């Protein structure tokens, strides 16, 4: 409720809740709970549902059922999806259902210490950080899959110039 109050104070009339919650929004019961709580606020609260069951990146949720119960789109926000075939299948289903997918784009195998972009500041403090390539490789994959499938996708929190150019 505090998020909705802050949104209303900032002039927002509609927000979309992300699905990376505990429990995750990977089933109708949780989705309906989020939407019911949203109805108690002064703004229009929508909710995304998860792309995969338990946000584990292994099995797609029942996207058709979740959309029928009010999911505005799908995401495993905060968790990058590593399986390209699964992402393609999710995109094909999203096209069929006419819903957007939103992706957290960073390849964890390329990151030594997350939380800061790798660059002069991170190197100065010996932190390491996330190289731009960790973001770029998943953005490239998902942009290409979206072009091939026709899916509507959102790339969350872009920080790499190369990623911006790919999205454009």
Q: Residue locations for each model-derived region?
A:
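A glycine-rich helix N-cap at a beta->alpha junction
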Residues: 36-51
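Gly-rich Lys/Arg/Thr-decorated short loops/hinges at beta-loop-alpha junctions or inter-strand turns
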Residues: 12-17, 43-46, 118-127
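Conserved phosphate-binding/catalytic loop of the ribokinase/pfkB sugar-kinase fold
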Residues: 54-58
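Histidine/acidic residue-rich metal-binding segments in metalloenzymes
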Residues: 59-168
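Metal-associated gating/positioning segment near the N- to mid-region
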Residues: 1-38
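Hydrophobic residues in well-ordered beta-strands that form the structural core
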Residues: 16-17, 47, 103, 155
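Short histidine/acidic/glycine/proline-rich micro-motifs that form metal-
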Residues: 20-24, 51-53, 80-81
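Acidic (Asp/Glu)-rich catalytic clusters
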Residues: 34-40, 63-68
